[in-house]
Amino acid sequence: MPKVNENSFKKIEKDVLKLLPPRPHKIEISEGQKFAKSIRQALSKYVTSVNHPIDFFSNQMLDVPFRQPLYADFLIQAKTIHQKEPIGSFLFTFKQEDSGSSIDIIFSPVSFYKISGLDAEFAPSVHRISFVWYGADNCIEDTVPNLAELIEEGKFHQFLTPVGPLVENITSTFVTRIKSVVKGEVLNNKSPPENVKLLLPSDLFIDLDEPNIDTLAPKHLLSFYYACVTYPVLHNVPVMALTFIKSNKSIRDLFCHLKVIYSDIIRTKYIAMQNDFYINKMSFGALCKLGSSSSETVPRRGNYHFRGSSLPTVEVPDFVADPGPWMTIL
């Protein structure tokens, strides 16, 4: 007796059954109650029941969806952003001219410090980790050939654009692909999306918001975060510094506060440049808005560890990226 192929038999059986008309449903039409019951029985074979209909509608229809962030992808040289750069670090892209190249130049707070010309006195922890990640064998300084000229003339920030917190870093031997949130809530690209905290070096962070006190004065709903690039003179050599500032004050009050903070540094720079001073060097720096968070949010302090080195950080859990233009500080 020949052996029957079970799969072939099931396929033939299925094809034959398709040729038969479907079994009819018995519907009672003589009485209204019996008609409704028979209709429900017929429909129950084709639909699924919802055990908690109220929860179903509230979860699927009433919950407010998150605001979709705007992502940006960049291809960069592998060594210009270290593979251990923490997720949440704020990034800047640098471009002097549109050369048509698909390779971008990206700076993090740590890599920016490495090319700034500052010593360990200004930010000890950032200085230490910058040499661990971007040491003497790194080519990060070569990405900007006229770096010294831009710093001396106070023009580096003119080619610098904030592109938001880092949310993905895919490293390879030669080219690295990174993703950042340019605008909107800082969420990663997973499904479902997860919140990413803004991470800033505490050595480079200044909180200008007054401590919470009992007062009848109205409070601002948001605190804004800014990047401040300045061009001081260190040991008669022009350098630049990147500082992150948190403030819920108006722009006018913020600039007045910055003039007080940097008054001695500005005076020292102008004294050092009095023999080589002209109008193009009058700019001391520039300020740029990066985004905001709730005014009730207090940035948390943390530490990022790497091979025995520790980088004190400031974490902002509800940061929303919304960068603005650079504003000159004279």
Swiss-Prot record:
It comes from Saimiriine herpesvirus 2 (strain 11) (SaHV-2). Belongs to the herpesviridae TRX1 protein family. The lineage of its organism: Viruses, Duplodnaviria, Heunggongvirae, Peploviricota, Herviviricetes. It comes from the Viruses. InterPro entries: Herpes_1 (IPR004999). Interacts with TRX2, MCP and capsid vertex component 2/CVC2. The gene is TRX1. Structural component of the T=16 icosahedral capsid. The capsid is composed of pentamers and hexamers of major capsid protein/MCP, which are linked together by heterotrimers called triplexes. These triplexes are formed by a single molecule of triplex protein 1/TRX1 and two copies of triplex protein 2/TRX2. Additionally, TRX1 is required for efficient transport of TRX2 to the nucleus, which is the site of capsid assembly. It is found in: Virion; Host nucleus. GO terms for molecular function: DNA binding. This is Triplex capsid protein 1. GO terms for cellular component: host cell nucleus; viral capsid. Signal peptide: none annotated.
